Amino acid sequence: MNSAPVPADTETRVNLLDLDREGMEAFFVRLGEKPFRASQLLQWIHQRGVTDFGLMTNLSKTLRSRLEAVSEIRPPELVLEQRSADGTRKWVLQVDAVNRVETVLIPDEGRNTLCVSSQVGCSLECSFCSTARQGFNRNLTTAEIIGQLWVAQHRLDEEQRISNVVLMGMGEPLLNFGNVVAATRLMMDDFAYGLSKRRVTLSTSGIVPALDRLAEVSDISLAVSLHAPDDTLRNELVPINRKYPIRELLAACKRYVGTENRRKVTFEYVMLDGVNDRPEHARALVRLLSHVPSKVNLIPFNPFPNSAYRCSHPETIARFAQTLQDAGLITTTRKTRGRDIDAACGQLVGKVNDRSRRQFRLHLAH
């Protein structure tokens, strides 16, 4: 249950976007109301997009007045919307006086996928990611995570729905464990957004203890930012690998999907020219994943200022993919979307206060 810490700029009123179902039920019990009120309020907030208690006509006037006195519905403030030539949309959201995050909608055939951020910045320093350049400022609250979905859904036409959510935006979701889990529960709640567990995907760089914790409380889809077939190279690209090396990470992935192997882990692999894209890398990746229920998503690198990397040539990516497919690995190559509005994978940067000096060094304890 999310205990819903009160945001720093509201000392008395609870932001109801911070509450998953259990938290909302507990909130109503504290008010002396029946727990079923939680379902009513979740529908008003998440399905209808209502933030004015006065419009919630199936609640008594007395209850509406009490809610007004002790709580609020405060999504992040939308400060900028951009549309790409390919249909991708990016929303820049103000989450406090100095910080902004970005969320991206990727429309495709028969689906609308929303890429959601979990932190302001990121502490993991992956060398190919522009978000890592800005450092880390803070975790997002549950309200700020689910608020991205709230804003996006209610910016779409009435007949359109967000069909998939991927926690692949700014930040490492497993380093904001409680708030992320609470937000995913709201995503899947039938009285909120009603997404199936297969349509909610969490992408992690490999925080092994937190991945094991996730297996205990959730079974949403899992993606892993792998990007290299061996520890030496991954240590350079994804420094958290020095704490949780590939062998430990793959073992945790196998524990997550369970013994029946009915689901597959998606392994993300950014294609960097001359770095991790040679034929021997492809063959090593085949060997590495041979005993893990997996599929591979190859990601063409998206350049950003002062990056040391270049994207692999399309022919190189195609040959790499063919090697994996010939070995029986399900392999896809991600379409590059939203590059003209800096919304492509690895390009989200937002706005972080004093970004270089306030990098947060997390103690990743078991």
Swiss-Prot record:
Cofactors named for this entry: [4Fe-4S] cluster
Subcellular location: Cytoplasm
Matches recorded under Pfam families: Radical_SAM, RlmN_N
Details of cofactor binding: Binds 1 [4Fe-4S] cluster. The cluster is coordinated with 3 cysteines and an exchangeable S-adenosyl-L-methionine.
EC number: 2.1.1.192
Entries under InterPro entries matching the protein: Aldolase_TIM (IPR013785), Methyltransferase_A (IPR040072), RlmN_N (IPR048641), RNA_MTrfase_RlmN (IPR027492), rRNA_lsu_MTrfase_RlmN/Cfr (IPR004383), rSAM (IPR007197)
Disulfide cysteine pairs (residue numbers): C115-C345
Residue positions of the active site: E102, C345
UniProt GO molecular function: 4 iron, 4 sulfur cluster binding; metal ion binding; rRNA (adenine(2503)-C2-)-methyltransferase activity; rRNA binding; tRNA (adenine(37)-C2)-methyltransferase activity; tRNA binding
Binding site for S-adenosyl-L-methionine: G171, E172, S203, S225, L226, H227, N302
Binding site residues for [4Fe-4S] cluster: C122, C126, C129
Catalytic activity: adenosine(2503) in 23S rRNA + 2 reduced [2Fe-2S]-[ferredoxin] + 2 S-adenosyl-L-methionine = 2-methyladenosine(2503) in 23S rRNA + 5'-deoxyadenosine + L-methionine + 2 oxidized [2Fe-2S]-[ferredoxin] + S-adenosyl-L-homocysteine; adenosine(37) in tRNA + 2 reduced [2Fe-2S]-[ferredoxin] + 2 S-adenosyl-L-methionine = 2-methyladenosine(37) in tRNA + 5'-deoxyadenosine + L-methionine + 2 oxidized [2Fe-2S]-[ferredoxin] + S-adenosyl-L-homocysteine
Keywords: 4Fe-4S, Cytoplasm, Disulfide bond, Iron, Iron-sulfur, Metal-binding, Methyltransferase, rRNA processing, S-adenosyl-L-methionine, Transferase, tRNA processing
Single Gene Ontology BP annotation: rRNA base methylation
Keyword Metal-binding (UniProt): yes
Record-linked SUPFAM superfamilies: Radical SAM enzymes
Record-level GO cellular component terms: cytoplasm
Keyword DNA repair: no
Domain Radical SAM core: 108-340
NCBIfam families: rRNA_mod_RlmN (TIGR00048)
Family: Belongs to the radical SAM superfamily. RlmN family.
UniProt miscellaneous comment: Reaction proceeds by a ping-pong mechanism involving intermediate methylation of a conserved cysteine residue.
The name this protein goes by in its record: Dual-specificity RNA methyltransferase RlmN
Organism: Methylococcus capsulatus (strain ATCC 33009 / NCIMB 11132 / Bath)
